[in-house]
C-alpha cells in the first residue's frame, strides 16, 4: 500500500448483552448533564486512542505507541487517572513474518466473558502488508489476563486492511473496518459485515463509505477508523478522513437503528466534517476517535488524538507527538451529536445553563454575554473556569473559541473581551464562585459568580443579556444561578 500517513483506528462500542452499557453508549443524558472537567492532553504520545468503561468500575485505555511495536493497556477508576496509570505491555510484535511491523490502532472489547483486542499489523518483509488481527484474553483484568493469538480477520480481499471495531445492534454483532478495495482508486473505504464469532466475519462485506468529498481526500483519499455511538433510535458512525496531518478530521454516517445496516443506502454521510483542526485553540488533525461515558454515567465523552502544531517535518508517520485528549460530547435538540471544536489544552470547558430558563446557556454574541437556547456554534457557549486573573481565591471564565478572552463586567454589563493585562481588567474578570443563590446547595451543579471588585453584585441575566447586579429577591437570585453542563 502507498505510504498513506499513519493508518488509524477509532475505537469503542461493541459488547455482549451483559455489557451494552460498557461499550455501546445508549440513550441516557438529557440535553444538559452534569459537567465533568478534565485536563488535556490526557496521555502524551499515544494515538488512535480508545477508552472503555467496564462493569468492574475501571476505565481501560489502549492506543498506538510511537514505536509501533507493542500493545499496551492502562486502567484507572477515573478518566483523569489514566494520565498517570501504570502501563502494561500485553503483547509484542513478532520478530519475523506477519504481525512483525506497524502495530497500529489496538481496540479492546469484552465479549461473552472474554477480552478481545483488535489491531492492525504489517510483516517484517513488507511493513505495508497491513492486515487485521485479534487477540483473545482470559481473566477478569485484561492487564493480567492470558492472551492468545486468534489470527487474522479474513475479508473479501487480501489487501491493506485496518481499524477493526465491533458493535451490537438489534442483537446482531457487526464488524466495521477500513480497507483498500481492488478497482477503486482510494486509499481506504469503510466496510461492515456480520460476525459469526469475535474473530470471524460472515457473509459479503458491504462498503458504506468511500472518500468522495474534497475534505476526505486531502493528502490521501481516506475513510478509516470507524466507531459507533448509539443514541435516540439512531446509529452514529464516526470515521477519520484525509492524511494524518493537520488535514485529518472526523466525518459522520447516520443510520436508523431499525434499518438494514448491511445495506449501503441505510447510511447517510454528513456533507461536512464534524470535527476539524482549529488554529485558535491550537489543535491540529483531530481524529481516530472513540466514545466513553463520564464517571457518573450521565455524559458522553469524546476520545481522540491530535497534535499541538500544524507543520510536521517529514512524514507524519514518523512524528511521535499525537496525544490522547478527551472532552464532553454534546447533543443537539434534534438528537444528533454536536462535537464542537477541539478545545484548548488545559482544563476542559463547561456550559453555564440558566437556572430559571431551562435550555438557555450563557454565550457570547458579538462579544456581548447573554443567555440563549440552541447556541450555534457550540463553542460560543463554552467557557473554561480557570484561576482568577486577580487571584484572591477567585475564578475567571475564559472563552473556548477565543482563548485569552474572558467574561468581564464593563459599566456593569458583561462582555467577552481580550485580557489587556491591566489591573482593571483583571479585577473586572475575576469572580468568587459561590453556591447557587437559588439553591444554597454548594454543589458543582448550581453556582453563582460574585464580582470581586463589586462585592454583593453577581453575574445575572435580565431578559437575555448578562449584567453584574445585586440579587436581593427570589427572581434576581434565580437569574444569578447557573448549572454547569
Protein language model regions, located:
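Short amphipathic alpha-helical linker/capping segments at the junctions of internal repeats
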Residues: 21, 376-382, 422-433, 473-485
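Extended intrinsically disordered, low-complexity coil regions enriched in Ser, Thr, Gly, Ala
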Residues: 364-377, 411-413, 418-423, 463-465, ...
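C-terminal region of N-terminal signal peptides and the immediate post-cleavage residues
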Residues: 6-8, 18-35
Amino acid at each position: 500500500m502507498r505510504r498513506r500517513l499513519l493508518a488509524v483506528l477509532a475505537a469503542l462500542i461493541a459488547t455482549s448483552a451483559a455489557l451494552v452499557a460498557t461499550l455501546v453508549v445508549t440513550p441516557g443524558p438529557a440535553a444538559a448533564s452534569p459537567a465533568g472537567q478534565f485536563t488535556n492532553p490526557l496521555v502524551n504520545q499515544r494515538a488512535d486512542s480508545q477508552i472503555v468503561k467496564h462493569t468492574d468500575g475501571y476505565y481501560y485505555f489502549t492506543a498506538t505507541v510511537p514505536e509501533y511495536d507493542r500493545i499496551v493497556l492502562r486502567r484507572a477508576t477515573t478518566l483523569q487517572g489514566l494520565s498517570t496509570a501504570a502501563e502494561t505491555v500485553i503483547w509484542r510484535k513478532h520478530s519475523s513474518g506477519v504481525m512483525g511491523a506497524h502495530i497500529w490502532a489496538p481496540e479492546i472489547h469484552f465479549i461473552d466473558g472474554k477480552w478481545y483486542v483488535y489491531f492492525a499489523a504489517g510483516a517484517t518483509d513488507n511493513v505495508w502488508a497491513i492486515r487485521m488481527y485479534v487477540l483473545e484474553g482470559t481473566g477478569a483484568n485484561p492487564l493480567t489476563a492470558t492472551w492468545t493469538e486468534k489470527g487474522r480477520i479474513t475479508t473479501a480481499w487480501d489487501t491493506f486492511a485496518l481499524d477493526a471495531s465491533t458493535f451490537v445492534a438489534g442483537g446482531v454483532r457487526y464488524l466495521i473496518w477500513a480497507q483498500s478495495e481492488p478497482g477503486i482508486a482510494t486509499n481506504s473505504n469503510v466496510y461492515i459485515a456480520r460476525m459469526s464469532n469475535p474473530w470471524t466475519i460472515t457473509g459479503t462485506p458491504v462498503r458504506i463509505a468511500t472518500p468522495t468529498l474534497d475534505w476526505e481526500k486531502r493528502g490521501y483519499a481516506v475513510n478509516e477508523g470507524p466507531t459507533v455511538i448509539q443514541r435516540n433510535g439512531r446509529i452514529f458512525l464516526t470515521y477519520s478522513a484525509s492524511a494524518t496531518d493537520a488535514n485529518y478530521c472526523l466525518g459522520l454516517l447516520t443510520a436508523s437503528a431499525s434499518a438494514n445496516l448491511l445495506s449501503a443506502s441505510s447510511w447517510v454521510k454528513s456533507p461536512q466534517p464534524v470535527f476539524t483542526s482549529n488554529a485558535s485553540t491550537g489543535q491540529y488533525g483531530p481524529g481516530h476517535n472513540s466514545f466513553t461515558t463520564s464517571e457518573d454515567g450521565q455524559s458522553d465523552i469524546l476520545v481522540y488524538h491530535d497534535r499541538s502544531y500544524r507543520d510536521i517535518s517529514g512524514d507524519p508517520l514518523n512524528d511521535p507527538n499525537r496525544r490522547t485528549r478527551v472532552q464532553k460530547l454534546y447533543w443537539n435538540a434534534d438528537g444528533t451529536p454536536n462535537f464542537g471544536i477541539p478545545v484548548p489544552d488545559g482544563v476542559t470547558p463547561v456550559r453555564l445553563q440558566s437556572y430559571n430558563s431551562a435550555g438557555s446557556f450563557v454565550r457570547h454574541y458579538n462579544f456581548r454575554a447573554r443567555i440563549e437556547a440552541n447556541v450555534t456554534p457550540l463553542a460560543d457557549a463554552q467557557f473554561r473556569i480557570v484561576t482568577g486573573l486577580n487571584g484572591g481565591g477567585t475564578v475567571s471564565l475564559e472563552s473556548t473559541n477565543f482563548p485569552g478572552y474572558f467574561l468581564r463586567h464593563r459599566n456593569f454589563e458583561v462582555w467577552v473581551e481580550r485580557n489587556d493585562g491591566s489591573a482593571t481588567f483583571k479585577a473586572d474578570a475575576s469572580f468568587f464562585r459561590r453556591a447557587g443563590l437559588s439553591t444554597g446547595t454548594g454543589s458543582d451543579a448550581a453556582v453563582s459568580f460574585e464580582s470581586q471588585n463589586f462585592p454583593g453584585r453577581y453575574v445575572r441575566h435580565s431578559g437575555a443579556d448578562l449584567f453584574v447586579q445585586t440579587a436581593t429577591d427570589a427572581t434576581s437570585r434565580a437569574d444569578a444561578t447557573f448549572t454547569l453542563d
